[in-house]
């Protein structure tokens, strides 16, 4: 079933008017937050076990506590709105349908961690939503929710909107920061970690759109009721985007524990023309794949992990029987070959050579040795690449080897 906690404001107010937002309770969470000790807010987030919704699953309360504890002046909070993962478009819906909530969430984050500046880093392809966020920021300033001495609490904070240039790798934290600084969007070595030295060498706290957008709702609504959704490691609700060969692709808010079957057949309307499922990719291009045997698995962090896939970015791509697994793998690999920034050798060369071997498989000229080399390259990439792009680029391929082993069983004639 679909629920409306994070999405409860969708369609309820005029997204161009702060007054309309305030009529549905807008900025009441901020008013409440500035009367609370910041530690009380992080304690609440820790108590309800909120994890980051960007894919890393890092506990939000712990992240904000660590950011607050870092010494340094002029701290920064960043909203990662560079939603570049393929088949993932849930954050776009939050920006489009609830822009003032995102602004409010960033102000609360700044209050908690002690930041004076914020950046929203928006992917280039979302340029049409830039005026919507700029308007929300401008009106928040006019009403005294941004600027100096916010709500008379001696708290100063401003938000700056920055658009990327279309590079997938800028979804990675350090590459995103270098892009904001006006440099080439390429990852850097860690440490120093960005919580200590991030944008312009200032302590930085980075969260994605969905993670931030949860906070105002948790402060105003009964966090205990929210925490009663889901179980174990997976608390609350999750925004997911479903794409591919389904009848009703779109974004849905589900309670953790909803089965994959319920998502695809009850919410997304089933597979087009009742065709068979060839594969489902979870978490975008860097995610893993499964076949139809996963349908009755609950959508939770732990259950999907046990099934060999992951929540990741919250994207689900459904491919029906008309598309061959090999063609899908080649398309996925082409994406990483094009999007690698080229800075580190394992990712730059590894993606190219995996692409070459997959093309040889399609042409019927691959050998057993080619398959062995491809596996070795994939493992080296996962262990030695500079950033998450190279580390996870082989996830789809390696999971396909487990789900479709016959595809990689090259006959002895070409060995």
Task: Name every feature range the model reports, one short phrase each.
Residues 21-26, 79-91, 194-199, 241-246:
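Gly-rich Lys/Arg/Thr-decorated short loops/hinges at beta-loop-alpha junctions or inter-strand turns
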Residues 98-112:
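Histidine-anchored nucleotide/phosphate-binding helix
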Residues 47-67, 164-178, 182-184, 337-349, ...:
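Conserved phosphate/anionic-ligand binding catalytic regions in large, soluble enzymes, centered on
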Residues 1-42:
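Cofactor-/ligand-binding subdomain signature composed of acidic, glycine-rich
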Residues 105-109, 256-274:
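Short amphipathic, charge-patterned alpha-helical segments
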Residues 130-256, 268:
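Hydrophobic alpha-helical positions that pack around
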Residues 56, 62-64, 88-91, 130-135, ...:
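Short acidic, glycine/serine/threonine-rich loops at helix termini
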